[in-house]
Amino acid sequence: MSIATEIIGVPEILDHFQSESYSPYHFFSSEQWAKFRADTPLTLTGDEVKRLRSMGDPIDLDEVRRIYLSLSRLLSSHVESSQMLFDQRNRFLSMSDVTKTPFVIGIAGSVAVGKSTTARILKELLGRWPSSPKVDLITTDGFLHPNAVLQREKLMQRKGFPESYDTGAILRFLSAIKAGRPDVKAPCYSHLVYDVLPDEYKIVDRPDILIFEGINVLQSRDLPADGKIVPMVSDFFDFSIYIDAAEDEIHNWYVTRFMRLRETAFRDPNSYFHRYASITDAEALEIAEDLWTNINLKNLRQNILPTRPRADLILKKGKDHLIEQVALRKL
């Protein structure tokens, strides 16, 4: 019997599946998942983890050992398998002058759930494999339409929703990456000014692995009436991860983070949210609750959570922000 089938009942990680025998996923507790680390070395220090984690995220070396070393080992096997398939296909086609395109990992999940921390931790771990792969990290924030466009289209209150992104630009970027093109530009975003930075780009030059992180990366698109092929962002992924948590927990993390930002980033006069630094705690709490209820909760329910079943791996967090359950798609 596999470890996955030893779990009593099915976790709430995928509550729409009634039995693991009918689920496309294997389920593991964090303790069971930790055993898959095997002899994977810990290549991060405690200080490095503190530097990589986002505000309010308590991830530490113990969490890296429990969850991320096993995940690093799993991803290593996928990357190696991808390389083997690439070599076999080249032999089949009698091609010898072809360079393998980047292995792309997509990371999705709600605002405030910890996607950025996961992405940064993975970037460091993967880059320290014995093979020393080149790993780049890009977020979808830079692919938001500029505020001027959102204001003109009356979409500022829909920022983060699918229509607020330049999906065409995302698809062109990923197409160029998967085509193996050099020096591909990714637009930059500033959380300080809450806007895309004009004429500022990050250059992605043929990495071995690209981590692409954002709330919308697993979303599907409606098929056009004319029947033309419409690519989805996830079509370019070799592996995808969804960071999951109970709705109430994400709500609490979002509000807590907002209140902490009032004491830090919002105090910068250049901050888009500087006006919130001088209001009372009660007023700030009311604003945070309103932003959660009318924007982020709606986006989670309508657009983000429905994409969860499309992920290859689901990491379910508990109330302490630490991962409690893992679901891995069956092959």
Swiss-Prot record:
A single MF term (Gene Ontology): ATP binding
For this protein, what is the EC number? 2.7.1.33
Query: What reaction is this protein's catalytic activity?
Result: (R)-pantothenate + ATP = (R)-4'-phosphopantothenate + ADP + H(+)
Q: Mainly resides where?
A: cytoplasm
Q: Which UniProt keywords apply?
A: ATP-binding, Coenzyme A biosynthesis, Cytoplasm, Kinase, Nucleotide-binding, Transferase
Question: Which pathway is it part of?
Answer: Cofactor biosynthesis; coenzyme A biosynthesis; CoA from (R)-pantothenate: step 1/5
- Name of the molecule in the record: Pantothenate kinase
